Regions:
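Short cysteine/histidine-rich zinc-coordinating motifs and their immediately flanking basic loops
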Residues: 170-175, 187-192
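Signature of the chemotaxis receptor cytoplasmic signaling rod
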Residues: 137-140
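Short, intrinsically disordered terminal segments enriched in charged and Pro/Gly residues
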Residues: 192-200
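Short, intrinsically disordered, charge-biased short linear motifs at domain edges
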Residues: 143-149, 158-167
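Cys/His-enriched microdomains
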Residues: 154-157, 173
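Short, non-ligating residues that shape and space the ligands of small metal-coordination modules
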Residues: 167-169, 181-186
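Flexible, glycine/small-residue-enriched loop-and-beta-strand segment within the central core
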Residues: 2-5, 10, 16-18, 25-125, ...
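Short cysteine-rich clusters marking metal-coordination/redox-active sites
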Residues: 159, 175-178
Length: 200
């Protein structure tokens, strides 16, 4: 009997052993491999591939034409823009087997990766970081960082709401949308006063 706690379009392929949480939706022509885990209230767009043993948290949105390969982990509330790219081997060759050389990639809670961005394997994208469209990310990204360009460079900082933060001389900033307070210390930003009901 089909589990009706989540929705799967008739054209999608869900392999035996895949786990999908309640309230999630899987759309046209998507393929979810065995032993993958998808959390609750996720939206998996059209033509998405989710590899074996991939772990996806709750509230994740994956737009069309994205492949999430082995070694990639997506925490809660991550957003993946259309046609963004993950990798899992640093030096692939068609004639050399490197399935034991996958380098893990972690996309932390609330991070956004824009359309057509590329994330090289073996790095971490920090909480609530925002990767701009078309950026090529080759190194670990700190929380709340705004990354643009090729190669990707930090060009600013953003709030949880994805709004650019403007820091004063004391390294203090407020999100104009949420009112949350942030503190810049060296090359790190921390959320010092979250909105009511939110975690810092």
């Amino acid at each position: 009997m089909q589990d009706t706690s989540y929705f799967v379009h008739s054209s999608a392929v869900i392999d035996a052993g895949a786990s999908i949480g309640a309230g999630s939706k899987v759309w046209h022509f998507t393929h979810i491999m065995p032993s993958s885990e998808i959390g609750e209230n996720c939206i998996i767009g059209q033509n998405v591939f989710i590899d074996r043993r991939v772990k996806i948290g709750n509230g994740v949105k994956i737009q069309n034409n994205v492949s999430v390969y082995q070694g990639v982990t997506l925490e809660d509330d991550v957003f993946l823009g259309p046609s963004m790219v993950f990798t899992n081997v640093i030096n692939p060759r068609s004639f050399i087997e490197r399935k034991t050389e996958f380098r893990p990639t972690l996309v932390c809670r609330g991070a956004t990766i824009g359309a057509n961005a590329t994330i090289l394997c073996g790095i971490e994208v920090g909480e609530y970081a925002l990767i701009g469209a078309g950026a090529v990310v080759t190194r670990t990204v700190p929380p709340f960082a705004l990354i643009t360009g090729n190669p990707g460079k930090r060009t600013g900082w953003v709030s949880k709401a994805g709004i650019t933060l403007e820091f004063n001389d004391k390294g203090e900033a407020s999100c104009p949308e949420s009112g949350e307070k942030y503190l810049l210390t060296g090359e790190a930003v921390i959320n010092v006063l979250p909105s009511p009901g939110q975690k810092g």
